[in-house]
Every structure is written in structure tokens, then in C-alpha cells.
Amino acid sequence: MELQEVLHMNGGESDTSYAKNSSYNQLVLTKVKPVLEQCIRELLRANLPNINKCIKVADLGCASGPNTLLTVRDIVQSIDKVGQEEKNELEHPTIQIFLNDLFQNDFNSVFKLLPSFYRKLEKENGRKIGSCLISAMPGSFYGRLFPEESMHFLHSCYSVHWLSQVPSGLVTELGISANKGIIYSSKASPPPVQKAYLDQFTKDFTTFLRIHSEELLSRGRMLLTCICKGDESDGLNTIDLLERAINDLVVEGLLEEEKLDSFNLPLYTPSLEVVKCIVEEEGSFEILYLETFKVRYDAGFSIDDDYQVRSLFQVYCDEHVKAAYVTFFFRAVFEPILASHFGEAIMPDLFHRFAKNAAKALRLGNGFYNSLIISLAKKPEKSDV
């Protein structure tokens, strides 16, 4: 099965769907929003062609469910807020938003929400229906999506850490896994494996920057958020917890060792330095903002979080209940690719073990997702300076 066919979130509205298990991502969007507003402010002040009439925006790797439209809402609100603050003709330009993800993404779950979303925009923002136009643009964001110099603003949250393919060179000349017992580029991976993943990310991210710089107008903006490398003190990340669960199944004879050794996630968590270096070497963009932040696995659930997102369960919960929350979110993201390799039948047992590992991490006070935000401006052509 082709990677693009399984690299998507759980669709629909079941208990394990992304639509029902994405409050963590809502929290991340809350963290990103101040940077988004500043990015929009700089964009509108740049006075790009046709921006007074229609601002063209794309969300790359939009996923599905309510979070997709939360991103759209934040972008629209930022544009309207800045327009009001600037007191100029940009107060209510038409906004054309393209939602991009791979072909297997559940776009229908988003489209079903549009009528109520448009009504809410009209009620809360004073935007008449028709002043915000939302459509889908399916396809890989590692390829061309839009005409040259046609877009004002590109946004992507929690997508660019996904690679276009599993790196080559993960099998030795003897046909043995070079990353035996490990499912991604971790601290325990041999140096050649770490280099293979870094090389693939460098190739993919360079392609991403080059292609989308061609689609952006001169001085257009791009805002990216992705998972990044953490600190030694953070403990195991969720991929490590998954890896332990799979290894336990192998040890107990419930899963063939070959299945584990032949599985490598097409995912890479870069460091801030790596991202900065790639952007500078590719050369199309100026870095306006670059920072990292960390959030606990169970953020978005606990009533102790210092964020706007709050749990539906306003009671004290132990680590097992919180671990179940973490597991549902993780399963919504990773189940399609895991089930395609290991089989549907073993998924309940696998995620049960994952939940136990997550509970241990939370009990020890460990368990963080590390994220990176980078705001970019396309460098003007010499003739535009």
C-alpha cells in the first residue's frame, strides 16, 4: 500500500476519530495565535498585489474535524482584527482559503461543518456569507499546489515533520534492519540511521520551501508549527511509548519480530538549529520569528493547564484517566499507518499497552511534546526592492 494512502488521521466521528480527539491541537493553536496575528499584521502592511480585494490563504496539512475550522477561524479573526486596528480598507477583504491534505483525508467531515461555521462568522465577525470562501486542494504539499505567485499566506500546523517517504538506507547489505527494535530516528538509533532520517528531512523541507516560495507573492508570509527535538530531561516521548508497546508484543510472541524490524515511521523531529540552517541554505525566505515551546501530553485535559482549552471532565483525574486521553489522541493520529503494517486485529492490544506506558510517564512527571514555530517572509525580488 502506498504511503500517501495511509498517512492520514482517523476519519469519521467514532470514539477513535481525530474529530473527537484533537483538543490537544486546539491548545497548540492557542499557543500559536499571537504569532499568527503578528504574521498577519506584517502581511497586510506589506501591501501585496490584490490584497485589498482578496487575500489568498492555504492551510497545508489541514487534517479533518473541528480543528481544521479553528485554524480558519483564527486566520479570519486575525485578518479582521488587524484591519480594524489599522483602520484602513482592509477591514473586510474577501478571504479565499484552500484546505490542503493528502487525498485520503476526510474532507467531508469538514464540509459538513461549513454551513454552521459561515453563520457563526456572520454573527460574531460581521462577515457576510460569501466573504470567506473555503475549498479543498488535495495533494502532497511536497509538490506544486497553486499557480506561481498567486498566494499571500501559507499556514501549516503539525504537518511538516511528516516525511514524503521512509528514508532509504535503513536495511544493511545483508538485508538486516539497521534500526533493529526501533521505529524512528531516536537517540538509540545508530548514526547511519539518524543521518538517513536527517538527509530525508533536509531534502523534503528544502523542496517544501522552494515549491511554496514559488507559489507565494513576493513578501508573502508562511507560518509553520511542527514537533521538534526535546530536552534530555523530558523523558520518553509518545513514539518511544509506542515503540515499547510494540517490543512487548514481540517479546510475548504476539507479533513477529520481522514486523517490528520492517517498520519505520516516516516522521522526523528536527532541532531548531536544523530548521534554521535549512531555511538559510534554501535562501527563499527571511526568518521573522523562530521559537520552541513544550506542552505536556495531557495538556488540554487537565483543569490545571494555563490555557483556554478546558477538559469536559472538571474533576480530579489520576494518571490512568489522563493516559486514556493521551492514547485516544495518539491513536487518532497514528492508527491508520500502524494498522496498515501490523494489522487491524492487534490495534486494541497495542493501544492498551501504550496507555499503560503513558500512565507510567505521567506518574513520573514526564511526558512532553516539544514544538517549534517559525514565521517566514518570502524575500523580494531585486526588482521589487
Swiss-Prot record:
Q: What class of enzyme is it?
A: transferase
Pathway where this protein functions: Alkaloid biosynthesis
Species classification: Eukaryota, Viridiplantae, Streptophyta, Embryophyta, Tracheophyta
Task: Report the EC code(s) recorded for this entry.
Answer: 2.1.1.-
Q: Where does S-adenosyl-L-homocysteine bind?
A: 18, 62, 67, 101-102, 140-141, 157
Which residues are recorded as binding Mg(2+)? 179, 261, 263-264
On whether Magnesium is a keyword of this UniProt record, the answer is yes
Q: Does the keyword Transferase apply?
A: yes
InterPro entries membership: MeTrfase_7, MeTrfase_capping, SAM-dependent_MTases_sf
Which residues are tagged with the site Involved in substrate discrimination? 155, 267, 344
Which residues are noted in the entry as caffeine-binding? Answer: 158, 161-162, 238, 369
Q: Which organism is it from?
A: Coffea arabica
What this protein is called in its record is Probable caffeine synthase MTL3
